[in-house]
C-alpha cells in the first residue's frame, strides 16, 4: 500500500458516500453488454457509479477559445474530458470492488452541464460477481 492511500480512501468516502477500498481494482472486467462471454453471473450486487464534477479554469477556457479560432480538435478540452471520464470510471470500479464485485455489466457514461462551465460526468453500471463457465 502506498503512502497517502488512507487519505485517498477518506476522499473517496467523502465524495461518493461509500468507503474507499484497499482492494485491487485492476482486475474488474467492464462491458457495455449485459453479459460477459465465457463467464456466468453468480450474483448481482447492484448499481455502481462514479461521479466527477469538473469546471474549466479561466486559462483552459482562454486556451480552448484560441484553439477554436484555428479549428480542428480542441485538445485542451479533449484532455479535460478524458481525464474526467477516467476519474469517474475509476470511482465506479472502486464502488464495484467495495461491493465485492469482479465485473461491471451494462456500463454507461452520462454528462450533464450543471451550470455554465461546470459539468458532471457519471459512469454507471451493474456490479456483478462472475466466474468462468466450465465446459461440460
Where are the regions a protein language model picked out?
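Short glycine-/acidic-enriched loop or helix-start segments at secondary-structure transitions
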Residues: 116
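N-terminal presequence-like segments and the immediate start of the first folded domain
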Residues: 2-58, 119-136
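Short, well-ordered alpha-helical segments
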Residues: 48, 53, 61-108
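Short, solvent-exposed loop/turn elements at beta->coil junctions and helix N-caps
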Residues: 33-36, 109-113
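Short, flexible coil/turn micro-motifs enriched in small/turn-prone residues
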Residues: 66-67, 112, 120
Amino acid at each position: 500500500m502506498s503512502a497517502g492511500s488512507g487519505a485517498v480512501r477518506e476522499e473517496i468516502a467523502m465524495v461518493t458516500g461509500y468507503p474507499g477500498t484497499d482492494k485491487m481494482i485492476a482486475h474488474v472486467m467492464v462491458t457495455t453488454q449485459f453479459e460477459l462471454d465465457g463467464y456466468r453471473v453468480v450474483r448481482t450486487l447492484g448499481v455502481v457509479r462514479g461521479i466527477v464534477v469538473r469546471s474549466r479554469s479561466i486559462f483552459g477556457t482562454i486556451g480552448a477559445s484560441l484553439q477554436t479560432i484555428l479549428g480542428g480538435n480542441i485538445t485542451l478540452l479533449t484532455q479535460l474530458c478524458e481525464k474526467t471520464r477516467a476519474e469517474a470510471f475509476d470511482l465506479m470500479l472502486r464502488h464495484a470492488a467495495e461491493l465485492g464485485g469482479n465485473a461491471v455489466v451494462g456500463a454507461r457514461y452520462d454528462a450533464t452541464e450543471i451550470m455554465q462551465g461546470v459539468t458532471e460526468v457519471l459512469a454507471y453500471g451493474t456490479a456483478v460477481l462472475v466466474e468462468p463457465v466450465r465446459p461440460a
